[in-house]
Amino acid sequence: MKDLARYRNIGIFAHVDAGKTTTTERILKLTGQIHKTGEVHDGESTTDFMEQEAERGITIQSAAVSCFWKDHRFNVIDTPGHVDFTVEVYRSLKVLDGGIGVFCGSGGVEPQSETNWRYANDSEVARIIFVNKLDRMGADFYRVVDQTKKVLGANPLVMVLPIGIEDDFVGVVDLLTRKAFIWDDTGLPENYEITDVPADMVDKVEEYREMLIETAVEQDDDLMMAYMDGEEPSMEDIKRCIRKGTRTMDFFPTYCGSAFKNKGVQNILDAVVDYLPSPTEVDPQPLTDEEGEPNGKYAIVSPDETFKALAFKITDDRFGALTFVRIYSGTLKKGDTILNAATGKTERIGRMCEMQADDRNELTSAQAGDIIAIVGMKSNVQTGHTLCDPKDPIILEAMVFPEPVISISVTPKDKGSTEKMGLAIGKMVAEDPTFRVETDQDSGETILSGMGELHLDIKVDILKRTYGVELEVGEPQVAYRETITQEVEDSYTHKKQSGGSGQFGKIDYRIKPGEPNSGFTFSSVVVGGNVPKEFFPAIEKGFASMMESGVLAGFPVLDVEVELYDGGFHAVDSSAVAFEIAAKGAFRQSIPKAGPQLIEPIMKVDVFTPDDHVGDVIGDLNRRRGMIKDQEAGVTGVRVKADIPLSEMFGYIGSLRTMTSGRGQFSMEFSHYSPCPNNVAEKVIADTKERNAKK
């Protein structure tokens, strides 16, 4: 039986280029999983094994690797930092027990760091902080620590102090032991010596050590009283308090170093062992009923329970179809039969393995706490599906993903590519819940939808290079929506008589604007039997089906509330079909009276620009209908936050590079829908109608 207290399921996440993947590489090197460390800038890293990742120097998928440190098993997930791939971060957080937040020593708390930190807070994932790249020009450990307080609202618990900075960075002082770890210039992680604290740092070390202990003992009233009386707690007691406060997210143990230069990585590994929780120390996953509502039961983390697991990632690589699974309860053995609770199908487990990024070790069994990959599942398993014991069917809390905001049309160039594309897209949709595909009913074109330009760019690249599909790609299209602005009280009667039994359904209703992000809601206040209750579902279905296409330009309709308050029926001619048709007619009749309005996706944009280009960048954002929300001066430039319509952001990366001589950076994520200005709405509606007329 494996000792779950020695398990650590952790994720590494941060902003693009803060050094997540390099940190992961160094962890694997130190734990003996790889013998030659690959470099991101050389396109050789272990966890970035897709062609697109190696070329772009960014992580797109979450790669899972297993390794060991001081008799503890680590399951490590290296997640993407680019906002278009935030879904990978989200679904990884769902199955992790702890994390390492990596921040750039010079860049500080960057936009995607903030987003990932917020997601981790929502998922209640305990973390340690690693301030990386202290050997870089402009690096400042203390400034980044301060930023984590101001920008993230975090409480960093400083555990080490840097010795030197930039080119003079040589190591760290461990505050608890008052020992200095100094590495030589060979770049080898094992080439370091432990010495006394440098004389010029003694006072600062004592100051920060006192703050560390004061914060830690707040977790234990007796220890705190003893400390206030002048008694220093034992090392064991301090570590116990730090572990407790880390698990409850009262603070975040904070380290520093240079992953690239192999300085300070051992301290992180020790911190993962000492302070991050094991699978048995986090809140168990809740179970739900078929409607997704919590039922008060939980997946207890124990190998003795019945099998319960969550499929959190589907991928197709050179080994075939892989389903990544976090086992919460029970044990899974080769040859066992399991149930996919979402599809109702059972399946016999053939092969399963633990992953070493793009390599794997075959397993005969796995248990609660493990993150594994099952090979070649046949039950149409998708991300978020619950896998369980057929004798004890359960449903784990679902994973919810954001809706796509941008679309492109793709057309295969020949028949061979058409067949390849169909197979490829089926696999890609299973792998990525934020990647959607539909066929335009009028033109027959295939429409790909995703989270941003880079997201779709990567998907098209995969279709072309991985699957050999020859494609013509259309211009990006914004996911406009329609809504209403006024309340309408109305009545509609559907009546049809053509020999034999006819059709009759009369409804009296109110249509009004719903709450933001409410979608479609239906309610009934009918008193008496004017409209029998058995017809309510048909009426709701009729209205809901019409929400897919609005009256302005055929865009889906958002945030509409329908209240049925009266109506009429015929004992012979009324039926569910008749009332469903009545509801559809009512929608067509009343929506034009309710002040229909075109709304557009607004993006939360975060731009970094050098000081000498701030005016140009802000002027450009204003021309893009941007609303500046905040400006924050940093050491190397200015960070500008703004809300900007997605339609104005196409090609922005090129414009920003031109304005800032290649030094500017930006990220964006969907924020909300907002009404289009009249001139914009008129043009969008006219262009859409013209485009539809040509189909």
From Swiss-Prot:
TM spans (from-to) = none
tr-type G domain mapped to chain residues: 5-280
Report keywords, A-Z. Answer: Cytoplasm, Elongation factor, GTP-binding, Nucleotide-binding, Protein biosynthesis
Name of protein: Elongation factor G 1
Q: Which residues bind GTP?
A: 14-21, 78-82, 132-135
Stored Pfam families? EFG_C, EFG_III, EFG_IV, GTP_EFTU, GTP_EFTU_D2
Provide the family line.
Answer: Belongs to the TRAFAC class translation factor GTPase superfamily. Classic translation factor GTPase family. EF-G/EF-2 subfamily.
Sorted alphabetically, the Gene Ontology cellular component annotations on this record are: cytoplasm
Q: Where in the cell is it found?
A: Cytoplasm
Give the originating organism. Pseudoalteromonas atlantica (strain T6c / ATCC BAA-1087)
What is the stated purpose of this protein?
Catalyzes the GTP-dependent ribosomal translocation step during translation elongation. During this step, the ribosome changes from the pre-translocational (PRE) to the post-translocational (POST) state as the newly formed A-site-bound peptidyl-tRNA and P-site-bound deacylated tRNA move to the P and E sites, respectively. Catalyzes the coordinated movement of the two tRNA molecules, the mRNA and conformational changes in the ribosome.
Biological process terms in GO annotation: ribosome disassembly
**Superkingdom of the source?**
Bacteria
List the Gene Ontology MF annotations in alphabetical order. Answer: GTP binding; GTPase activity; guanosine tetraphosphate binding; translation elongation factor activity
